[in-house]
Design a protein with these regions (language model features):
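Active-site and substrate-binding clefts of carbohydrate-active enzymes
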Residues: 3-311
């Protein structure tokens, strides 16, 4: 929305960036219908209540053999209650009611997208695209009936209307090759749309370390771009893995929310420390095979990662 120059069609067509990649805007209307704590579908009284779990509801005697040996309570996944409303007195979960709500919400979501796209077409001379990305954990984890909602929404959209069809960003670009060129404005889908979730007093300490590691990754990639040595190649690949894992936005997010502060801080430190040790070894061209193998055993994400991208 705030790119330079401003996008002609707002968030409803992609734009190309000077570096080449296309950017798509996240649709706010469809996002609000699923994510909003006040008006989103997942808060319907008929749906299963995520927080009411027998691990906290039942007596320790009833939970013998289910909880840890020390008796500490935890989520078990067995939840007998529905959301009901803003009350501690929760009604029992009724699967039929929940499926009825999912069906109604799927129909409403379908008709909302149909009307939205019809309205957009009346103001645009190109095909609009509505991009609706969501965290996968919303469907089934936080919103137990979420997978059924998706199933019903897709079926209704295919069989009950013809105003829109499903596509992917890649397919849309293949069908529509010409787009506006702009420089995107920094933004996120976090609180207020910018960076305050990932950069404040709770997590700001990580960024000097991440920036140093990023510079060092580029330094070593350029210094050894032509290497044929297997050990150096493996070490540089593992450095790239450790850097990517340290840069995961989950760690800063968890530090901000406080839900797993110590774990998130430890993960960040561990990846940075392993990266730094590998950096020192690569710089000296003296890689410790045992240490490298241990790092690869711990984290082997992206087995074919090309560290030369950092050149």
């Amino acid at each position: 929305m705030f790119g330079t120059p401003r996008p002609r069609y707002a968030i409803y067509t992609p734009c190309f960036t000077p570096a080449g990649p296309a950017v798509f805007g996240r649709d706010r209307d469809s996002s609000r219908q699923l994510w909003s704590a006040e008006e989103g579908y997942p808060g319907d009284p008929a749906y299963r209540d995520f927080y009411r779990d027998i691990g906290f509801d039942l007596s320790l005697e009833d939970l013998r053999g289910v909880l840890p040996a020390d008796g500490s309570r935890k989520f078990t996944g067995l939840k007998y209650h529905r959301i009901t409303g803003r009350t501690h007195e929760k009604g029992l979960y009724n699967r039929g009611w929940a499926m009825g709500a999912a069906d109604a919400h799927a129909g409403h979501f379908m008709s909302s997208r149909r009307d939205q796209i019809a309205n957009l077409r009346g103001h645009m001379n190109v095909d609009p695209i509505v991009v609706s990305p969501f965290d996968a954990e919303l469907f089934g984890h936080w919103w137990f009936e979420g997978p059924e909602f998706l199933n019903l929404f897709i079926r209704k959209s295919v069989f009950d209307q013809s105003a829109f069809r499903f596509t992917t960003p890649t397919s849309y670009l293949a069908e529509h090759e010409t787009h506006q060129l702009l420089i995107p404005s920094p933004s996120s889908w976090g609180h207020k749309g910018y960076w305050e979730v990932w950069l404040d007093q709770s997590n700001g300490w990580i960024y000097p370390h991440l920036h140093t590691a990023a510079r060092r990754m580029t330094e070593m990639a350029r210094a050894h771009r032509d290497t044929k040595a297997e050990m150096l190649d493996r070490a540089l690949r593992q450095m790239a893995r450790e850097l990517l894992l340290a840069q995961s936005s989950d760690w800063a997010f968890l530090m901000k929310t406080g839900t797993a502060n110590q774990y998130a801080a430890k993960r960040t430190r561990d990846h940075i420390l392993r990266f730094t040790r590998l950096y020192d070894q690569v710089r000296a061209e003296d890689v410790d095979p045992a240490f490298l193998q241990n790092c690869e055993w711990r984290d082997n994400i992206f087995p074919s990662l090309n560290w030369r991208h950092y050149v």
